[in-house]
């Protein structure tokens, strides 16, 4: 009986030590959680990519960063309580900021300033605590600030107010013409002194031209403006592709 106890006691102690070691290792583990949906931003605006650890814990002493594929380009890196700007990819230098007001709760966010078309795509956020590291994916969608403008919208914007204005002017013109014909017929001799004699006999095609021409002018101008804006944005995008740094 004493022999059994002498054999079982060391094995029990060994099991307890293993359990303690496992509990310590699991106590330092966590998960990294991203926003779960794409973050959208306009060209030239700012974008914030949030990231947190679960369960929440103080991440001040951890290494926190964002990188992009390919080649794991460093977008932003926080280590030893400081931002490591020297390790950033050249295209992100001076454009990123780590928002760490809630880092004591394990919550941070990456702010990207002056967003470019080339910033669109996937990002990886990671937290590293000594030798343990977890990460999560974050996606950024960059949108054209004039994405809602198209020729159909331009036509609608131009036509509706201008058409209402021109219809109103045309109706007033026809009303005055009819009234002058009926009421001032007897005074036509006097009217000839102040009005063109052809004023009371304006052909329909002239009235139509009078109504349509002012509508087409602003519409053409808006379409030209729309094409210019899109060419400018496309040129900016191509320039970023040629000179990413």
Curated annotation (Swiss-Prot):
Biological process terms in GO annotation: cell adhesion; regulation of cytokine production; response to folic acid; response to lipid; T cell receptor signaling pathway
Primary location group: membrane
All ranges on the Cytoplasmic side of the membrane: 177-208
Domain Ig-like as annotated: residue spans: 30-139
Function description: Mediates homophilic cell-cell adhesion. Minor component of the myelin sheath. May be involved in completion and/or maintenance of the myelin sheath and in cell-cell communication.
Gene3D superfamilies: Immunoglobulins
Gene Ontology cellular-component annotations: cell surface; external side of plasma membrane
Disulfide bonds: 51-125
Extracellular side of membrane: 28-155, 230-245
Entry-linked PROSITE patterns: IG_LIKE (PS50835)
Protein's organism: Rattus norvegicus
Glycan attachment positions: 58
Localisation: Membrane
InterPro entries hit by this protein: Ig-like_dom (IPR007110), Ig-like_dom_sf (IPR036179), Ig-like_fold (IPR013783), Ig_sub (IPR003599), Ig_V-set (IPR013106), IgSF_BTN/MOG (IPR050504), Myelin-oligodendrocyte_glycop (IPR016663)
Name the UniProt record assigns to this protein: Myelin-oligodendrocyte glycoprotein
Oligomeric form and interacting partners: Homodimer.
Transmembrane intervals: 156-176, 209-229
GO MF terms, alphabetically ordered: signaling receptor binding
Family: Belongs to the immunoglobulin superfamily. BTN/MOG family.
Signal sequence extent: 1-27
Keywords annotated in UniProt: Cell adhesion, Disulfide bond, Glycoprotein, Immunoglobulin domain, Membrane, Signal, Transmembrane, Transmembrane helix
Free-text tissue specificity from the UniProt record: Found exclusively in the CNS, where it is localized on the surface of myelin and oligodendrocyte cytoplasmic membranes.
Membrane topology listed for this record: Multi-pass membrane protein
């Amino acid at each position: 009986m004493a022999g059994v106890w002498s054999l079982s006691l060391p094995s029990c102690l060994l099991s307890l030590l293993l359990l303690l070691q496992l509990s310590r290792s699991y106590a330092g583990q966590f998960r990294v959680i991203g926003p779960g949906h794409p973050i959208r931003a306009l060209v030239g605006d700012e974008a914030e990519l949030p990231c947190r650890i679960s369960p929440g814990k103080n991440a001040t002493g951890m290494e926190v960063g964002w990188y992009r594929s390919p080649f794991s380009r460093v977008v932003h890196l926080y280590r030893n309580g400081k931002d490591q700007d020297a390790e950033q990819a050249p295209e992100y230098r001076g454009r990123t900021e780590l928002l760490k007001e809630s880092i004591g709760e394990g919550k941070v966010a990456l702010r990207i300033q002056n967003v470019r078309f080339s910033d669109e795509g996937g990002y990886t956020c990671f937290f590293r605590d000594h030798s343990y590291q977890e990460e999560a994916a974050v996606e950024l969608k960059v949108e054209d600030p004039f994405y809602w403008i198209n020729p159909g919208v331009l036509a609608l914007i131009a036509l509706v107010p201008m058409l209402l204005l021109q219809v109103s002017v045309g109706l007033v013109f026809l009303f005055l013409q009819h009234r002058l014909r009926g009421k001032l017929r007897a005074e036509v001799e006097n009217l000839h002194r102040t009005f063109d004699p052809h004023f009371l006999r304006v052909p329909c095609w002239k009235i139509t031209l009078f109504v349509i021409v002012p509508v087409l002018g602003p519409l053409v101008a808006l379409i030209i403006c729309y094409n210019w804006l899109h060419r400018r944005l496309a040129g900016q995008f191509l320039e970023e592709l040629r000179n990413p740094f």
